[in-house]
Amino acid sequence: MPKKNEAPASFEKALSELEQIVTHLESGDLPLEEALNEFERGVQLARQGQAKLQQAEQRVQILLSDNEDASLTPFTPDNE
C-alpha cells in the first residue's frame, strides 16, 4: 500500500485502493486505531477521486465549448 499521504498514480488505482479499504473496514477485524487510519486514508482517496472527476468534467466542458455545434448539458449522475 502506498504511503498514507501519497496520491495514487491514477484514478483507477485510487478507486481500487478505496475498494480494498472498504472491504477491510467492513470485515470488522481491524483494531480501532488501524480502522481509523484506514478510514482516514479512504476519505483522502475519495476526495482525490472527486477532484479528478471534477477536473475531467471541466476538460470535457472546455472541449465541447470549442465545438459550437455541440450542445452542453449539465451532468447529473444516476443515483444507485
Swiss-Prot record:
Coiled coil: none annotated. Pfam families: Exonuc_VII_S. Its main location: cytoplasm. One of its GO terms (biological process) is DNA catabolic process. It catalyses: Exonucleolytic cleavage in either 5'- to 3'- or 3'- to 5'-direction to yield nucleoside 5'-phosphates. Transmembrane segments: none annotated. It is an enzyme of class 3 (hydrolase). Its EC number is 3.1.11.6. Keywords: Cytoplasm, Exonuclease, Hydrolase, Nuclease. GO terms for molecular function: exodeoxyribonuclease VII activity. The keyword Isomerase does not apply. GO terms for cellular component: cytosol; exodeoxyribonuclease VII complex. It is found in: Cytoplasm. It comes from the Bacteria. The keyword Hydrolase applies. Gene3D superfamilies: Exonuclease VII, small subunit. Heterooligomer composed of large and small subunits. Belongs to the XseB family. Bidirectionally degrades single-stranded DNA into large acid-insoluble oligonucleotides, which are then degraded further into small acid-soluble oligonucleotides. HAMAP family: Exonuc_7_S (MF_00337). This is Exodeoxyribonuclease 7 small subunit. The gene is xseB.
